[in-house]
Amino acid sequence: MAEFKQQGPVCIVSGLLDQQTVRSLWNDRSSILAPETAALQLAEIEYCDSAGVAFLLELVSIFAAKGISLKLVSPSEQLKKFITLYDLNDFFIEEAK
């Protein structure tokens, strides 16, 4: 299961972000993050599959529809491999700046 911990404008995502978790989070996707969230810090994600990546990109899309830029920063080592494998580098930032 994934956990979302809000710390001001940053939300720290940890745990498992897989298909099963995404199914349980999907209906709340529009309200899972505080409106002031500017970045999702992903270093503590233990495992993320394609459904998890799609969920993260959906959160970015929801914020973009409101005219807000939501950044995906500091992906975990496991997530970095997935990002490289599927050429998703344009969507993620190595470290929070």
Where are these regions (language model features)?
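STAS-like cytosolic regulatory interaction modules
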Residues: 1-51, 58-97
